[in-house]
């Protein structure tokens, strides 16, 4: 793509999840601007498509985006998010959109929604589920925050999301930190299930003295039933 062409969306953070999500957007035909403070991350990023631009300057990154600007944060939760938001606010205009795709605490997201609104910036907290593979090929997306922002980014998010029976695994939950709240509940359920699987294995292996093949057969049977 040419330097004059404006990008549809920008991604900040090119770690495992950020790079995978960016490639997902690129593969779906969205012109994507990429920014990372890490020179190593910028050099490591590769895509078979040419509809993206990588920046080491946050100002140039923002200038490359079409209006209203759509900025997707894929960075570590907590203070780094607040630091990046602080660096973005002077560069953005009213109606521009910031989306946080990390695992931020939902109450922090609600505060950020309110603070950004004071500057006329639309803020969203977005739960992303599916890990590296999901981010690349289609994650489950739990969106919360500004309903106005949702209407402007919905087409992009639904396009990159996983699909089940023809429908995008992507939805708007509610305002504030609702998206990150649902992701938190999702994670709690997931980790509880993983713990149950581990304890079940331990019971079969060390109490029932079952061999690896027997245990595998049990789990395979469960995979074919309602426990799948």
Task: Please provide the spans of the model-predicted regions.
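The beta1-alpha1 cofactor-binding region of Rossmann-like NAD(H)/NADP(H)-dependent oxidoreductases
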Residues: 39, 58, 78, 106-108
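Rossmann-fold dinucleotide-binding core
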Residues: 81-84, 99, 105-216, 225-227
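Glycine/threonine-rich flexible loop motifs
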Residues: 70-87
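Beta-strand segments within the central parallel beta-sheet cores of soluble alpha/beta enzyme folds
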Residues: 13, 214-221
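Short, conserved loop/helix-junction motifs that constitute active-site signature segments
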Residues: 90-94
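NAD(P)+-binding Rossmann beta1-loop-alpha1 motif at the extreme N-terminus of oxidoreductases
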Residues: 1-69, 95, 132-135
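Structural motif
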Residues: 12, 35, 55-57, 74, ...
